[in-house]
């Protein structure tokens, strides 16, 4: 019988040959969970232990969800889409992707949803890339001071609460006080900069509509289109009928689109209309996810909700290209209460606020800006020198006017100086009124405010102020066009320019006709009569002689 012999070297060689020739087949690995509870735009999912915060999850049917709560054995998820067909027990898959949106110049002139998908029926958008919604804001060393003006075209704002590129300026007020109109005017006023073709002047705009009616959003689109401003504007729409998750992420989508241009050395402006509705949507989501409620039932991190959004607005350093992202958040108050929770939060985050009052609006003062409570913490740094020189007295004159107006309501007798102050204040208030969607260029603003603050309008009746202003500005453009050119080119208001303005307004007053039909400047004043030629009544004093009886006493 043959004896079986085992040779170890043969076994070793066979194993080595097998290992060398082995080719591993790549198998797809996928994490799958299932829906435990669903309802009210929220789903609780189990079985996905490696899910990341803000990761996108995919439900059956392609609906996406955003992972917000990462708990032991369970995930709280916000459904971004139609939740009707999501049921308990359905499979949920990880995508491995953090929430991001496409960005690029292709978004200009388009209307998109908070996920960056076009909803205007104009076809797909060619994106230049994607940008995560949750990115760190620029650090302190990556920024530089705000010093370039961003003109809104609104006299009251550009003169008293100036906005600079990279600033965050809050627009706050009750409903129906003109908050959206102020923001839309600021977008429309960038039209000339866009037409110049100069990237250093151009400002690309993003308008984020949160929780608004679709008809209102349609009106905004039409207004921008008619004004020629839609070509450089992107609209991110999260209407009132959308799930709370869309209203929550819409502002971050708008800022991500604007940040793309900022980091490419360009200038952008983003309007958040309005953050009150985003806070309410976040409160609803947090309560449904059973997060602990705080003041007014808002979650404890509602301040961080807005601070991490608005801190992205910045003026980048020259090393990073010098781009900027300017933010105009809008907050709606109730009964002019700016001391409520969300308003005070956003006021403390931003670089100033423009407070619109319903009382002023109802009085016909539009834009209804309350000069006393409105402020810009950037101030004169974001103004051209010409505007800074003429607007210095404007805020003081208006503040004194409001104080005297309240005092005179009691019927007290006022001295001549006070009456003059009231008269000039009334004319300044009339001068700052402005029609909707009719922004003023900076040179026309400078000339208009110069005329008001230097007393050149004191002899013009209040009811004729706006007509006088419009006709005078057109007159300067026709006959003294060099004045506008000098302001645009130098940004200063020198002595020679002031002399030209004084002669121009004197010349214009001679031909201006009041609404009463009279000339503003009379042809020739009658000569005063000599005092000797004036007939005067002489009073003779007669002294009565005392009688004898009186003398005896």
UniProtKB/Swiss-Prot annotation:
Keyword Membrane carried by entry: yes
Primary location group: membrane
GO molecular function, one term: proton-transporting ATP synthase activity, rotational mechanism
Region listing for Disordered, in residue ranges: 527-553
Sites where the protein binds ATP: 173-180
Keywords for the protein's UniProt record, in alphabetical order: ATP synthesis, ATP-binding, Cell membrane, CF(1), Hydrogen ion transport, Ion transport, Membrane, Nucleotide-binding, Translocase, Transport
Gene3D superfamilies assigned: 2.40.30.20, ATP synthase alpha/beta chain, C-terminal domain (1.20.150.20), P-loop containing nucleotide triphosphate hydrolases (3.40.50.300)
Localization, UniProt: Cell membrane
Membrane-topology annotation of the record: Peripheral membrane protein
Marked site positions, Required for activity: 374
GO CC annotation terms, alphabetical: plasma membrane; proton-transporting ATP synthase complex
Biased composition (Basic and acidic residues): 533-553
Catalytic activity, EC: 7.1.2.2
Matches recorded under Pfam families: ATP-synt_ab, ATP-synt_ab_C, ATP-synt_ab_N
Enzyme class per UniProt: translocase
Task of the protein: Produces ATP from ADP in the presence of a proton gradient across the membrane. The alpha chain is a regulatory subunit.
Family that this chain belongs to: Belongs to the ATPase alpha/beta chains family.
Subunit structure: F-type ATPases have 2 components, CF(1) - the catalytic core - and CF(0) - the membrane proton channel. CF(1) has five subunits: alpha(3), beta(3), gamma(1), delta(1), epsilon(1). CF(0) has three main subunits: a(1), b(2) and c(9-12). The alpha and beta chains form an alternating ring which encloses part of the gamma chain. CF(1) is attached to CF(0) by a central stalk formed by the gamma and epsilon chains, while a peripheral stalk is formed by the delta and b chains.
Name of the protein this chain belongs to: ATP synthase subunit alpha
Species this chain originates from: Parafrankia sp. (strain EAN1pec)
